[in-house]
Amino acid sequence: RDNALAIAGLLNRDIGGPSAKPYQPSGYYEAIQFPDRNYVADTDDRQYRRGLYMHWQRTFLHPMLANFDAPSREDALCTRTSANTPQQALTLLNDPQFVEAARVFAGSLLLSRRPKMDDAALLN
């Protein structure tokens, strides 16, 4: 996630402060057996903070973190498990933060190239 945001130029590199709340699927916390939780995703540049600052619910990892084998927070680990699963590819293709990073990166590529005469013909 941090790499995708950095490549797109979206990564917020601020140090310290409260945790960031990126997009979560609606109703994701409904299964938690605690009092009602109202998760409100950040809509400003805080949603692009480094993964280190992402809000973690101890028993319910953010779906993107779970899909990419994030370790549990109960134990200290020297190495992480590594797996390649179809869910990871689907996350990269469909998670709103990855889609937004790809859109912004593609836009910056299009704006950075010099237009050619053939471009007008391609559009028609």
Indicate residue ranges for each PLM-predicted region.
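An acidic, gly/pro-interrupted, aromatic-rich
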Residues: 1-122
